[in-house]
Regions:
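FIC/Doc superfamily catalytic core
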Residues: 1-141
Length: 141
């Protein structure tokens, strides 16, 4: 193991110990952590699709309803829709609902709401790529 990796792992262990000492975390702290993770998930998910909103702009759009100058309506809707899809998935998990093909299509429809009515909730029929990646998603053949 190289020295840089060892230092990072030691730092992670130290931070984990500090976090463990604070347990159980207060409910409001847990909610803040979850909210931050949800925004980061929305930001990263949209970023790989070519959305140019920054992490901070994504938070403003989702949490405050702010319109960002110079950004397209599509980019705003992608952030809002992704956030709403996360909430929907959490609701499904809380209710212990079985995930079905219909559920997956409903999530997809939420993601594309107001963006691509023709394809919302449907399987894609054309190949896609991830911006800046050599990884190829499953193709629709």
């Amino acid at each position: 193991m190289n020295e840089d990796l060892k230092l990072l792992l030691d730092k992670a262990d130290t931070l984990k110990g500090e976090l463990s000492a604070l347990r159980p975390l207060p409910e409001d702290a847990l909610q803040k952590i979850q909210d931050a993770l949800d925004i980061e998930y929305t930001y990263e998910s949209n970023r790989i699709e070519g959305n140019t909103l920054t992490l901070q702009e994504t938070a403003l759009v989702v949490n405050e309803g702010v319109t960002i100058s110079g950004k397209s309506m599509r980019e705003h809707l992608e952030a809002i829709n992704h956030s709403e899809a996360i909430d929907y998935i959490k609701d499904i998990a809380k209710k212990d609902i079985e995930i079905s093909e219909r559920t997956i299509k409903e999530i997809h429809a939420l993601i594309l709401h107001g963006i691509d009515r023709e394809n919302a909730g449907k399987y894609r029929t054309v190949p896609v790529m991830i911006s800046g990646s050599i990884q190829m998603p499953p193709q629709p053949y």
